[in-house]
Amino acid sequence: MKKSLLSLLCLMAALSGQAQTELSGKSLLGGLRARHIGPATMSGRIADIEVVNRKPTIIYVGSASGGVWKSVSAGASFRPIFDDYTMSIGKVTLDQNHPDTVWVGTGEPWVRNSTSVGTGVYKSVNGGTSWEFVGLKDSERISDILINPKEPNTVYVGVQGHLWNANTERGVYKTTDGGKTWNRILFIDENTGCADMEMDPKNPDILYAAMWSHRRYPDFFDSGFTGTSGLFKSTDGGKTWNKIHNGLPTTTLGRIGIAAAPSNGNILYASVESKDIKGMYRSTDAGANWKLVNTDFNNGVRPFYFSRITVDPKHDSILVKCAFTPIISTDGGKKFRPIQSVHSDVHAAWIDPNNTNHILLGTDGGVDESLDQGCTFKIRT
């Protein structure tokens, strides 16, 4: 019996050693190609949506930890196009004059405790078939990317920065050579990053940047903790910046979302978090003055998780605010109605410039589509 047991143990040891030898090195996969299969706990959460305006059947979505996906069938099906790179996505931006040029900022900017990190900015010139890393490796989270429509090699990146600690690679960065080199053009301090940006629809040298100091800890989140959050404007392509706070809360500010009306650059909307008031502000003079227009629940709930505003391309009084329950206004933000029958937690919205009744929403559950200005929605994916 002892001999049999000893023989069995020797055989198992030999097989174990053989298995370890066979499974080591490149022989493990041979000619097979590995693909990303997880973890998938948050990968369905949509962080951003971009659509080719002249051909809205082509849709790109960036997800929290699932990479970038592309549809050429108006959302009937999607395929992954970024699986060899960082899975956490913050922003996808298209050069609408050359829509095969796609910029991706990695690192989800919606900073709940389940968020994952990015590794900088990537660029494709063939619709996502191949990608090139173009910089800002230590950015960790990118909130926005803006392209100068008159000079497509001039690109601005809003770097939100590290969530759990201070870092210096944050603020607003600019390239004038398509990503070969970068200059930081707006920096507050190592705790304050850029949460959102906007470009004037007629003059690309006019820029807006929402700067945000924030820090996450294991047991709580601190928004605006250094008192350096604020809204800034440049009229010279980022060479100089001025704070534009007239009419905004005078107490400590937190996260701010900013949007300009594509049909009228003087009309701006800002979703503002402060210590005493959270709400929607409106400017009719390109940010010189602001007026509080709405303090509904979904205009202030969880600003670290929802802050984007999308303005109708043709009507400056129609806007969608991303929120726990998304809301839409048709009177410049005075009143909002909830958008029902969609998955809760909406982070991105797109309004078709050719048919403004056509709306896409990016939610924690995927992509939803409306053809009647948000009255009804159907799930696309």
Q: What residue ranges belong to the model's regions?
A:
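Beta-propeller blade termini and top-face loops
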Residues: Q20-T381
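Bacterial Sec-dependent N-terminal signal peptides
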Residues: M1-E22
